[in-house]
Amino acid sequence: YNKYHVKEIDIFDPLFTINKKRVIEICKEIQKRNINIAWSCRSRVDTIDEEMLVEMKKAGCYRIYFGIESGDEIILKKIKKFTKISQIKKAIHLTKKHKILAFGYFMFGNPGETKSTIENTINLSLSLPLDYAQYNRVSTLPGTVLYENLKNTLGEDYWKKYVKDKKFERALPRFDCNLSDEILNKYIKKAYMKFYFRPIQVFRIIKSINSIKEFVRYVKAGISMIIN
């Protein structure tokens, strides 16, 4: 901080807020040392509470990225997220109460996913006071239960083969999900359009703009979203 004059850091640890005592100690130490720094972090919705948010705000936290994943209780159980819709709503509302930006990550194509469960996810994202939302197709990565299930289905370790030789690259089938990439992409576009082109969201974005350069960037992003 003193040597390189760092003004902002982003904590990528997805489990940063899992140990409340540790988080509060870090926040108090930042305040004790008078470190004037802005920072953001990742969090689950069920590991954050008001006491923690108060200290995080005092210590310079200005944005939290939440892995919400789905807005359907059945899907959340299937992917073993072990969170509830009520916890999602509480975490986001508490974060906004303390004037911290809330960013939500959502995934389409989970095991058991249907058009109906995707609609539930989109509707939840629209009902939350999120500043930003990101929607993606599920990626099956090594080390996850989903990948182990897929590996058993395929009868091979795709990632091991791919790492050794890129010629083995191919689209992986989805485990327990019959929705095609084309359908998922349509829902992703629908979600982005519905989320970012609402009057309230446009107002939030305009309110957050601090420069002409930033304004131009948002305009380009909006045009790109419409075209693509």
Task: Identify the residue ranges that each predicted region occupies.
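Short linear elements at protein peripheries
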Residues: 218-228
